[in-house]
Each structure stands twice: as structure tokens, then as C-alpha cells.
Design a protein with these regions (language model features):
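Short, intrinsically disordered low-complexity segments
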Residues: 2-3, 54, 158
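C-terminal motif of bacterial Sec signal peptides marking the signal peptidase cleavage site
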Residues: 15-18
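N-terminal secretory signal peptides
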Residues: 26-74
């Protein structure tokens, strides 16, 4: 009787575990076919992204961003922005990225901060981690005012948390 009980519990655990909802994969594998938000490679040091070269890609939904008369930019739901972070600063030495960082516009999502889900893909195994705390949004809020990166948003317009808008 004891062995049957153990087998029944083990079977139930396996059945319940197999029904668990998997976390969706947010960052597309084919992102390199997307448009880049900035044509050039970015090499200036940006806190939180390492000191190497960066390339930023945006999906086709994001290319329909709305630019208001006051310079504000709003990205449509479903926009995905992926930043490759490299360890080198010279594109002639470029290899696979050290990290992939992403923003997914999903204002209604439980894990969204500022209307975006902030994602880190581990390049070694392809798993993704959602930053549900305030780490990313705290820095990216600065994109909505004048800042020292790129063209600097001199008018301090709302940029939907994106430093290098499309």
C-alpha cells in the first residue's frame, strides 16, 4: 500500500509539472534581420550595459512609432527592441554578443515596468530572465528628459524610455 501511495504522488507531481505554463520567449532569434534604431555602432559607455560596442534592433511593429509635434515618441504595443552588448569596442573584432538585452512593449503585462517588459537573454544557453524590479526602468526613465547619450533629447520630450529612438 505504501509503494502505491508513493507512486500515485510521484505521478501527480509529474502530471502537474507537465501542465505548468512555460514563460514565453520574448527576444526573437532572427532579430538581426530587423532594422537598427541607429545605423552606427554605439561605443560610448552607458551605465548598466558594459563598456563594449552595442547594436540596437527594432521589430517592424516598433517602426510604426508615433512622433508627436512636441517631439514625444510613443511605441505601439508589441514593439520589441533588442540591444546586443559586446565586450569589444572595435567592430572589426566583433564576435557573438556577450549579452542580449530587450524591451518588449506590453503595458498590460504583470511584469511590465513603464509599459515595457525588460528582458535579459543568457547567450550561453538561450534562457531569458525578466527584470521585474525597478533596475532597468530607473535608468531608462532618464531617456524621457535631456540626457548625455546620442543626440541627448535636448527638448526633454517623452521618449517612451528609449535612449536611441527609431
Amino acid at each position: 500500500m505504501g509503494r502505491r501511495w508513493v507512486l500515485a504522488i510521484a505521478g501527480s507531481v509529474l502530471l502537474i509539472g507537465s501542465c505548468a505554463e512555460e514563460q514565453p520567449e520574448y527576444l526573437a532569434v532572427d532579430y538581426e534581420s530587423w532594422e537598427r534604431t541607429v545605423a552606427s555602432d554605439l561605443t560610448e559607455i552607458v551605465p548598466g550595459h558594459g563598456g563594449g560596442l552595442r547594436r540596437i534592433y527594432i521589430n517592424s511593429i516598433g517602426t510604426d512609432a508615433v512622433l508627436d509635434d512636441d517631439g514625444a515618441i510613443r511605441y505601439p504595443d508589441g514593439t520589441i527592441i533588442i540591444k546586443e552588448a559586446h565586450t569589444v569596442t572595435d567592430s572589426s573584432d566583433l564576435e557573438a554578443p556577450a549579452a542580449l538585452l530587450g524591451m518588449v512593449k506590453a503595458p498590460g503585462a504583470e511584469d511590465a515596468r513603464g509599459g515595457w517588459i525588460w528582458v535579459y537573454r543568457h547567450v550561453d544557453d538561450g534562457t531569458e530572465e525578466i527584470f521585474a524590479e525597478e533596475y532597468c526602468i530607473t535608468c531608462h526613465a532618464n531617456a524621457n528628459e535631456s540626457h548625455p547619450y546620442g543626440e541627448g533629447n535636448p527638448r526633454g520630450a517623452f521618449r517612451d524610455f528609449v535612449f536611441y529612438p527609431y
